[in-house]
Amino acid sequence: MAKVADKPFFPKPFLSFLVLSIIFGFGITLSEAGFPKIKHYKWDVEYMFWSPDCVENIVMGINGEFPGPTIRANAGDIVVVELTNKLHTEGVVIHWHGILQRGTPWADGTASISQCAINPGETFTYRFVVDKAGTYFYHGHLGMQRSAGLYGSLIVDPPEGRSEPFHYDEEINLLLSDWWHQSVHKQEVGLSSKPMRWIGEPQSILINGKGQFDCSIAAKYNQGLKQCELSGKEKCAPFILHVQPKKTYRIRIASTTALASLNFAIGNHELLVVEADGNYVQPFVTSDIDIYSGESYSVLITTDQNPLENYWVSIGVRARLPKTPPGLTLLNYLPNSASKLPISPPPETPHWEDFDRSKNFTFRIFAAMGSPKPPVRYNRRLFLLNTQNRINGFMKWAINNVSLALPPTPYLAAMKMRLNTAFNQNPPPETFPLNYDINNPPPNPETTTGNGVYKFNMGETVDVILQNANMLNPNMSEIHPWHLHGHDFWVLGYGEGKFYAPEDEKKLNLKNPPLRNTVVIFPYGWTAIRFVADNPGVWAFHCHIEPHLHMGMGVVFAEGVHMVGMIPPKALACGSTALVKNYPRLP
């Protein structure tokens, strides 16, 4: 098993909010100022015919690639992406998942929150600093475009001359996703219909955009399966992990799934978990990991098994009915042929409903030595109840009985320009009734839509208690992974049932809670997080399951908007902001 260095390393933020505003506002290049490099990309987003799982379909790609191109930079670098929308009939934005966007909240890539959607034929330029090493990704954030295939990897290395607190010889990058044969537009219409038409389970699991439908590369172990006949040159041919014996590999794993929670395992190999969501964790050994939509991990493996054999890599579905075959590929010990199948069948995915196993993995994640510690006390605490509801017969998801419906004018611009009629100025409820029974369906399933904002004072320490509950049908509660834009947060703890402060306060971990940007709520349970509202902007906080967000499962946070500097004009060209003349672009 790989060794991990004792010395922690945590890169400091590269630029302050003010310096970023000055640089971007006045067009000073970083090379002129003596700062780190600029990574410049020109992307065209368009629909393409593709065969992700050996069945031809339409995907949303970038520059003719699916998944999109990988961005690779060092912490402190500036990333510039000129994004041209070639979709013809719909807008587009891209969210840089896990990037904090300090000083550039307009570049967060959230339609109706940080910017206007980019119209067909138009180009929008994203500029932002990647300020912290880690494993990240990017994806569409308008409608359900992530489910259509608009995603790619974003890898940030330490600043030049710095090293990570662990050693490895080489690395492999894996982007996991789920795939449907039904178009995203049909899915969206079905979710918005009365009665609601559910999207169903995915047809395939993709590994770096590659999967197999209606056949298996492991059919020889199961006579009921059809063997895939592949030459290796097809778009759906497995992405093989080629390795040399007696080396240590860092495998970066990110999940951009629209629905599925996944389990990752490699036959005969242990995994040493060292990073989660761009933050170092106390290393621990496990046979497999559960990874929820929006999460990322780095694991180290040592190729110390029989070098004459190859080994299975298996990605199975967890927390949902097992109707989707596992995604499979090979850990290919060179110089063995990649066509040589392992002697044993693929690792078996744990039972889909074994939440105790999921919790045992999640509860082992702690911050690495030297990580920032949370403030001891909070200034404000929100209790967010997650329920399934209806509005006039339409099925919705709601938080504290409000289903999020985004306004046509982006919050960031509306608040900066003080357009008080652009959205509801009354904030949503900060808690829910103490006597609410989370173990039964809502007594009053009717809910309302809303677009109010939770506003925080700059520097305020905020606790959020995410509370899960029963759905509309009895005895049903689902896992929900929640992602916060613009911040990392400390995961203080998890619990069963309804959060009860006098008792559950004692369970919160203030010593070494992990920093994350995505966290799971287990069925009928609660999750407590803490963050500091120190990043001027407007930020989404939402379930990372695409259909759930589409149906209203999210809220919006705002802090320090008066401190936000220049907002590019193209981010303002919609809704009420498009009518404002002579808006001062600089503070």
UniProtKB/Swiss-Prot annotation:
Residues 1-33 form the signal peptide. It catalyses: 4 L-ascorbate + O2 = 4 monodehydro-L-ascorbate radical + 2 H2O. Cu cation 1 binds at H95, H483. Belongs to the multicopper oxidase family. May be involved in a redox system involving ascorbic acid. Keywords: Copper, Disulfide bond, Glycoprotein, Metal-binding, Oxidoreductase, Repeat, Secreted, Signal. This is L-ascorbate oxidase. Disulfide bonds join C54-C236, C116-C574, C215-C228. The keyword Acyltransferase does not apply. Glycans are attached at N360, N401, N475. Residues 38-157, 169-335, 379-559 form the Plastocyanin-like domain. The lineage of its organism: Eukaryota, Viridiplantae, Streptophyta, Embryophyta, Tracheophyta. It holds the Pfam family Cu-oxidase_3. Dimer. Cu cation 3 binds at H141, H485, H542. GO terms for molecular function: copper ion binding; L-ascorbate oxidase activity. It is found in: Secreted. The keyword Glycoprotein applies. Cu cation 4 binds at H480, C543, H548, M553.
